[in-house]
Protein backbone atom coordinates (compact mmCIF):
# COMPACT_ATOMS: atom_id res chain seq x y z
CA UNK A 1 0.00 0.00 0.00
CA UNK A 2 1.35 3.42 -0.96
CA UNK A 3 1.35 6.05 1.76
CA UNK A 4 -0.46 9.23 0.71
CA UNK A 5 1.27 12.31 2.05
CA UNK A 6 -0.03 15.85 1.97
CA UNK A 7 1.68 18.01 -0.62
CA UNK A 8 2.67 21.65 -0.39
CA UNK A 9 0.18 23.76 -2.33
CA UNK A 10 1.84 26.99 -1.12
CA UNK A 11 5.55 27.54 -0.41
CA UNK A 12 4.67 28.23 3.25
CA UNK A 13 3.22 24.71 3.57
CA UNK A 14 6.71 23.21 3.28
CA UNK A 15 7.82 24.29 6.76
CA UNK A 16 4.69 22.94 8.44
CA UNK A 17 4.89 19.64 6.56
CA UNK A 18 8.58 19.32 7.39
CA UNK A 19 7.95 19.81 11.12
CA UNK A 20 5.00 17.40 11.14
CA UNK A 21 6.97 14.68 9.36
CA UNK A 22 10.08 15.21 11.48
CA UNK A 23 8.05 14.85 14.67
CA UNK A 24 6.50 11.65 13.26
CA UNK A 25 9.97 10.26 12.48
CA UNK A 26 9.16 10.18 8.73
CA UNK A 27 12.58 10.75 7.15
CA UNK A 28 11.41 9.67 3.70
CA UNK A 29 8.43 12.03 3.89
CA UNK A 30 10.73 14.88 4.93
CA UNK A 31 12.99 14.23 1.92
CA UNK A 32 10.00 14.12 -0.44
CA UNK A 33 9.59 17.85 0.25
CA UNK A 34 12.80 18.36 -1.80
CA UNK A 35 13.47 18.15 -5.52
CA UNK A 36 15.53 15.16 -6.64
CA UNK A 37 18.66 17.32 -7.14
CA UNK A 38 18.12 19.66 -4.18
CA UNK A 39 21.03 20.96 -2.14
CA UNK A 40 20.99 21.37 1.62
CA UNK A 41 23.71 23.38 3.38
CA UNK A 42 23.94 20.90 6.24
CA UNK A 43 25.78 19.61 8.28
CA UNK A 44 27.48 22.89 9.11
CA UNK A 45 30.20 23.72 6.60
CA UNK A 46 29.07 20.97 4.21
CA UNK A 47 26.50 20.38 1.50
CA UNK A 48 24.19 17.42 1.17
CA UNK A 49 23.28 17.02 -2.50
CA UNK A 50 20.33 15.07 -3.88
CA UNK A 51 17.18 13.67 -2.34
CA UNK A 52 18.77 10.25 -1.70
CA UNK A 53 21.54 11.81 0.41
CA UNK A 54 19.06 14.14 2.10
CA UNK A 55 16.96 11.09 3.02
CA UNK A 56 20.03 9.50 4.62
CA UNK A 57 20.72 12.66 6.58
CA UNK A 58 17.13 12.79 7.83
CA UNK A 59 17.18 9.09 8.78
CA UNK A 60 20.10 9.80 11.10
CA UNK A 61 18.37 12.91 12.43
CA UNK A 62 15.04 11.28 13.30
CA UNK A 63 16.72 8.24 14.86
CA UNK A 64 17.29 10.33 17.99
CA UNK A 65 13.58 11.33 18.01
CA UNK A 66 14.08 15.11 18.23
CA UNK A 67 11.08 17.38 18.64
CA UNK A 68 10.75 20.31 16.25
CA UNK A 69 8.68 23.37 17.08
CA UNK A 70 6.79 25.15 14.33
CA UNK A 71 8.58 28.42 13.61
CA UNK A 72 6.56 31.45 12.52
CA UNK A 73 7.44 32.20 8.87
CA UNK A 74 8.64 35.54 7.62
CA UNK A 75 6.86 36.90 4.52
CA UNK A 76 7.50 34.71 1.47
CA UNK A 77 8.99 36.27 -1.67
CA UNK A 78 7.64 34.78 -4.91
CA UNK A 79 8.86 35.44 -8.44
CA UNK A 80 7.25 33.23 -11.07
CA UNK A 81 7.92 29.63 -10.10
CA UNK A 82 10.51 30.44 -7.41
CA UNK A 83 9.88 31.31 -3.78
CA UNK A 84 12.15 32.32 -0.92
CA UNK A 85 10.86 31.17 2.44
CA UNK A 86 12.48 31.92 5.78
CA UNK A 87 11.93 31.66 9.50
CA UNK A 88 13.72 32.99 12.55
CA UNK A 89 15.01 29.88 14.30
CA UNK A 90 13.74 28.77 17.70
CA UNK A 91 17.18 27.25 18.39
CA UNK A 92 20.74 28.56 18.06
CA UNK A 93 20.71 28.41 14.23
CA UNK A 94 19.83 32.11 13.94
CA UNK A 95 17.58 31.76 10.91
CA UNK A 96 16.52 29.35 8.21
CA UNK A 97 16.00 30.03 4.50
CA UNK A 98 14.86 27.92 1.59
CA UNK A 99 14.28 28.37 -2.11
CA UNK A 100 11.30 26.41 -3.39
CA UNK A 101 10.15 25.81 -6.95
CA UNK A 102 6.60 25.38 -8.20
CA UNK A 103 6.22 21.99 -9.84
CA UNK A 104 4.27 21.35 -13.07
CA UNK A 105 1.28 20.13 -11.00
CA UNK A 106 1.23 23.40 -9.01
CA UNK A 107 2.73 22.00 -5.79
CA UNK A 108 6.00 23.26 -4.30
CA UNK A 109 9.29 21.51 -3.44
CA UNK A 110 12.48 22.82 -1.89
CA UNK A 111 15.47 23.29 -4.18
CA UNK A 112 17.95 24.95 -1.81
CA UNK A 113 17.87 24.77 1.97
CA UNK A 114 20.02 26.55 4.51
CA UNK A 115 18.63 25.45 7.88
CA UNK A 116 21.41 26.97 9.95
CA UNK A 117 23.13 30.34 9.50
CA UNK A 118 25.93 29.76 12.02
CA UNK A 119 28.49 28.53 9.52
Task: Please give the residue ranges for each predicted region.
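Short glycine-dipeptide loop
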Residues: 36
Amino acid sequence: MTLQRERAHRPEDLTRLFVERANEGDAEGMALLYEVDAIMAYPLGQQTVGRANITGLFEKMVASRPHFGLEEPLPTLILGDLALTSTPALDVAGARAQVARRQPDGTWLRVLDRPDFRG
